Amino acid sequence: MKAGIHPDYKKVVFMDTNTGFKFLSGSTRGSNETVEWEDGNTYPLLKVEISSDSHPFYTGRQKFATADGRVDRFNKKYGLK
């Protein structure tokens, strides 16, 4: 591997802006904002709009859209099924 071409991988804190949920993970992204984590160390803070704490798939508040297709509309129009 060539030296100096790979991004710097470090620990950062991600914060869900909708719920305020924070988690520590590794990333190559940096930030000017920092936050003190539970272990007492200071890490860069990256704000995200959606995470597993607020995404409907993970929270169980998922809504399923039911769209009638052409066949369903045909059957409904002509009284079939």
Swiss-Prot record:
<comment type="subunit">
    <text>Part of the 50S ribosomal subunit.</text>
</comment>
<protein>
    <recommendedName>
        <fullName>Large ribosomal subunit protein bL31B</fullName>
    </recommendedName>
</protein>
<dbReference type="InterPro" id="IPR042105">
    <property type="entry name" value="Ribosomal_bL31_sf"/>
</dbReference>
<keyword id="KW-0689">Ribosomal protein</keyword>
<dbReference type="GO" id="GO:1990904">
    <property type="term" value="C:ribonucleoprotein complex"/>
</dbReference>
<keyword id="KW-0687">Ribonucleoprotein</keyword>
<dbReference type="Pfam" id="PF01197">
    <property type="entry name" value="Ribosomal_L31"/>
</dbReference>
<dbReference type="InterPro" id="IPR027493">
    <property type="entry name" value="Ribosomal_bL31_B"/>
</dbReference>
<dbReference type="GO" id="GO:0005840">
    <property type="term" value="C:ribosome"/>
</dbReference>
<comment type="similarity">
    <text>Belongs to the bacterial ribosomal protein bL31 family. Type B subfamily.</text>
</comment>
<dbReference type="InterPro" id="IPR002150">
    <property type="entry name" value="Ribosomal_bL31"/>
</dbReference>
<dbReference type="GO" id="GO:0006412">
    <property type="term" value="P:translation"/>
</dbReference>
<dbReference type="GO" id="GO:0003735">
    <property type="term" value="F:structural constituent of ribosome"/>
</dbReference>
<dbReference type="InterPro" id="IPR034704">
    <property type="entry name" value="Ribosomal_bL28/bL31-like_sf"/>
</dbReference>
